[in-house]
């Protein structure tokens, strides 16, 4: 059974999440308490978020300047296929081989594929936040960031993968043996191509990750049923039609199978404090699966119109927008658009791909590329990940 959660969207009005909660109607207040059916027995989890400064990840350029050189580059040759990839690895200060450390595996989008192994470090926040002084002071950990010579999967012409996807599982195993990794605390995350790869591996190998953070990607939902037993948070921007529709498909699968999850709509303009407040409310759902959509119009579109970055020889791919008739669940209250407000009061999720009329593929790609870093500034979510 699904768990319902309502969060007010008031960042665009300059109001705090707390003040916003004070203006809710009685109906919204009732749903914001994570209403459950009789069959839902999960209680709210106790979290210890707030240990790490929630504003440290705001400046991407500063992260790149400070930490992109903190990684070593190592070649891995796969015995099964003979293929070679270069991975970036960060070892915590005072690394001791006799100890065991949690490990984050971050996989970038396809714009980072190519000959420059460090491209996956400098494209955005996703790799470097985990190696920052602020994060490592509270969570000493190993960070693994592979870079592939080519795009490793295709979601445009059906769903297909190259040998590099399965190679990634063997790479993680190899690194876990080579370094002092606590194999019960491996955390998977990635954006776009990296999100899709992490979705696939989490589904195929249920014991691989302790928890996952999926960021703006999608995959064939018929292959993802094992996610129902996984612990994760899944981010997608509503203006990124492919990723958002893919996320909705997973929620619909959970609905059909009676699996609990918590969903909330967030505002991309929220401050670090507002994001932390929203995270606390989200986690009060007490489920293992969390879904967050960035409200339409709250993500600033990127100037990028292609997945082919400076390190990429081929484009990433996206499915055309999919119309879904999935069962509607509770969503946070209104944005500026009255139609969204009416849908919220009715307990509906926003329709995929509707955002502000930006339904062209080019505009969707711009929002897609821009949305990655929004997830990796949610420090409280990162802290929750490491509690698993």
Regions found by a protein language model. Give the residues of each.
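Active-site machinery of serine-nucleophile hydrolases
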Residues: 103, 107-166
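Primarily recognizes the serine-hydrolase "nucleophile elbow" in alpha/beta-hydrolase
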Residues: 177-178, 184-228
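Gly/Ser-rich "nucleophile elbow"/oxyanion-hole loop immediately N-terminal to the catalytic nucleophile
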Residues: 94-95, 99, 153-192
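A domain-start/cap signature at the N-terminus of enzymes
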Residues: 21-22, 30-33, 39-101, 189, ...
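C-terminal catalytic histidine-bearing segment of alpha/beta-hydrolase fold enzymes
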Residues: 235, 240-244, 260-388
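Low-complexity, Pro/Thr/Ser/Glu-rich flexible segments characteristic
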Residues: 24-48, 326-344
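C-terminal motif of bacterial Sec signal peptides marking the signal peptidase cleavage site
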Residues: 16-19
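Positively charged n-region of N-terminal signal peptides that target proteins for export
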Residues: 1-4
């Amino acid at each position: 059974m699904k768990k319902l959660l309502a969060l007010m969207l008031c960042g665009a009005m300059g109001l705090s999440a707390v003040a916003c909660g004070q203006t809710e109607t009685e109906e919204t207040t009732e749903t914001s308490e994570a209403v459950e059916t009789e069959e839902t027995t999960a209680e709210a989890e106790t979290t210890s978020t707030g240990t790490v400064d929630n504003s440290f990840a705001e400046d991407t350029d500063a992260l790149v300047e400070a930490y992109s050189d903190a990684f070593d580059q190592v070649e891995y040759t796969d015995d099964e296929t003979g293929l070679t990839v270069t991975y970036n690895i960060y070892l915590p200060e005072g690394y001791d081989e006799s100890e065991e450390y949690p490990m984050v595996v971050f996989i970038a989008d396809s714009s980072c594929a190519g000959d420059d192994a460090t491209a996956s470090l400098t494209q955005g926040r996703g790799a470097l936040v985990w190696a920052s002084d602020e994060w490592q002071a509270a969570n000493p950990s190993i960070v693994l960031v592979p870079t592939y010579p080519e795009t490793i999967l295709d979601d445009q012409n059906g769903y297909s993968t190259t040998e590099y996807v399965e190679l990634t599982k063997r790479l993680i195993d190899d690194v876990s043996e080579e370094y002092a990794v606590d194999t019960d605390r491996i955390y998977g995350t990635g954006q776009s191509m990296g999100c899709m790869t992490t979705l696939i591996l989490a589904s195929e190998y249920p014991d691989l990750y302790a928890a996952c953070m999926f960021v703006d990607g999608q995959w064939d939902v018929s292959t993802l049923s094992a996610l129902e037993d996984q612990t994760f948070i899944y981010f997608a921007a509503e203006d990124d039609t492919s990723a958002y529709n893919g996320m909705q498909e997973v929620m619909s699968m959970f609905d059909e199978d009676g699996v609990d999850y918590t969903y909330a709509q967030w505002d991309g303009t929220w401050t670090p404090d507002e994001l932390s407040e929203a995270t606390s409310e989200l986690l009060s759902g007490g489920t293992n699966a969390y879904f967050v959509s960035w409200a339409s119009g709250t993500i600033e579109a990127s100037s990028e119109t292609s997945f082919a970055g400076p390190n990429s020889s081929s484009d990433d791919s996206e499915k055309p927008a999919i119309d879904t008739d999935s069962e509607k669940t509770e969503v946070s209250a209104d944005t500026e658009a009255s139609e969204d407000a009416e849908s919220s009061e009715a307990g509906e999720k926003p329709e995929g791909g509707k955002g502000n009329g930006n339904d062209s593929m080019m505009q969707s790609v711009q929002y897609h590329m821009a949305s990655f870093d929004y997830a990796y500034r949610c420090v409280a979510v990162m802290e929750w990940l490491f509690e698993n």
